[in-house]
Amino acid sequence: LTAFAEACGVTAERARAYDPQPGCQAYPAYVSWLALNASPPDVILALTANFSAWGGYCARIAEALRTHYTFPDEACAFFDFFAQPAPDLDARATAAVDEALKEDRLDVVAAHRYGRLLQAYEATFWNSLKAIP
């Protein structure tokens, strides 16, 4: 993200002095909580849906940075990377969920709750960025 920060005019000194926005920490904290506490098949289902939305956001951000701010490709590389679907992620996720279904290890209610909360925490992330003066 160094090239992106530089394109935004963020100096090394300013980056060191940055105080994280609490609302921007909720999503990664929740993903960590899921990794420690939730059943893998439930998390796979929730994250697969969330990553699809995230990839769309990244594609739109990269396009906007280039179109409206003339950011170079290097500055958009992070967003370009996540805008592209992982080559076999959906197939691997489907196989894992299918196996969990066959073994009655998928809690659909929990998976939906995790997905809903991931989306809510992601919205909190974006709203926190929007609120920065």
Region spans (language model):
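Active-site-proximal alpha-helical scaffolds that flank and shape metal-associated catalytic sites
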Residues: 1-85
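Long amphipathic all-alpha helical oligomerization modules
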Residues: 83, 87-115
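Acidic, carboxylate-rich catalytic segments that either coordinate divalent cations
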Residues: 105-133
